[in-house]
Amino acid sequence: MSIEERVKKIIVDQLGVKEEEVKSEASFIEDLGADSLDTVELVMALEEEFDIEIPDEEAEKITTVQSAIDYVQNNQ
């Protein structure tokens, strides 16, 4: 499974959204209905899945599906 597929699966699992809703440009809060707690849990799930540490100032920038994919790809 590619990084993109793994990130999208985490988003589907964490936010309880349909896979087809998880488009690259989708915003977690505006498009996928996440709240601030959801985004914190999403970052924690990404850290666990990819065994990376995401500093708070970086986590704040991860607001869309593509930004999550890009962050993981650049920090693995």
UniProtKB/Swiss-Prot annotation:
Residues 1-76 form the Carrier domain. Signal peptide: none annotated. GO terms for biological process: lipid A biosynthetic process. It is found in: Cytoplasm. Its main location: cytoplasm. It comes from the Bacteria. Pathway: Lipid metabolism; fatty acid biosynthesis. 4'-phosphopantetheine is transferred from CoA to a specific serine of apo-ACP by AcpS. This modification is essential for activity because fatty acids are bound in thioester linkage to the sulfhydryl of the prosthetic group. GO terms for molecular function: acyl binding; acyl carrier activity. The modification O-(pantetheine 4'-phosphoryl)serine is found at residue 36. Keywords: Cytoplasm, Fatty acid biosynthesis, Fatty acid metabolism, Lipid biosynthesis, Lipid metabolism, Phosphopantetheine, Phosphoprotein. Gene3D superfamilies: ACP-like. GO terms for cellular component: cytosol; membrane. The keyword Nucleus does not apply. Pfam families: PP-binding. InterPro entries: ACP, ACP-like_sf, PP-bd_ACP, Ppantetheine_attach_site. Belongs to the acyl carrier protein (ACP) family. NCBIfam families: acyl_carrier, PRK00982.1-2, PRK00982.1-3, PRK00982.1-4, PRK00982.1-5. Carrier of the growing fatty acid chain in fatty acid biosynthesis. This is Acyl carrier protein. The gene is acpP.
